[in-house]
Amino acid sequence: MKKLVLLLLPFLALISCRKPENVQRMEELLHGDWHGVEITNHLIAQGLWDTLHPHSITDVIASFDTLNGTFIVDSAGTTVDSASLVIDSDSVISVLGAVNAIDWSFDRTMINGFGQPVLQQLEAQFTGNQKFKILRITEDELILYFDEVVPVSIQGFTADMELRHTEYWQK
């Protein structure tokens, strides 16, 4: 009996290491190169003002390697960012160490003079780590989203800015 238990123990350990089927399917769909469509950044200071900044990212390719846990962003043949990729669940991923993300995810030319200091403060507080909700993933469409509240101070004025960030990608 003891030998049977010892033989079955490694088998049971292997079975318990399997990922749930829905996570495996999401990893299969996510893995590979995704071509940028658009990023929309919505900055909101509740009760004061808000501004919506959609911009094209058709020159950007995001490579999600779910096997090795890496995320690489390429623009016109040049790597502009790289990070670790963590699969948190079938609907949440984390990108860790994408230190240049603000550079490629905001179009600075669309942000007015008042918004520039806000962007600079977001940049100063950004760690390169972000948790994304997967709003939609199919074989040819990916929509990622996060929202975050960031305290911002400009010339003595302080407000909690909400950043709602949505990325649209296609295979």
Please identify what each model-predicted range represents:
Residues 1-4:
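Positively charged n-region of N-terminal signal peptides that target proteins for export
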Residues 14-16:
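C-terminal motif of bacterial Sec signal peptides marking the signal peptidase cleavage site
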Residues 31-52, 101, 143-152:
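Buried hydrophobic residues that stabilize the cores of well-folded domains
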Residues 41-46, 59-139:
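Contiguous, well-ordered beta-strand patches that form the walls/edges
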Residues 139-171:
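Edge beta-strand at a domain terminus
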Residues 18-35:
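N-terminal helix-cap/turn-to-beta initiation motif at the start of protein domains
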Residues 50-52, 122-123, 155-160:
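Short consensus segments that form the blades of beta-propeller domains
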Residues 7-8:
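Sec-dependent N-terminal signal peptides
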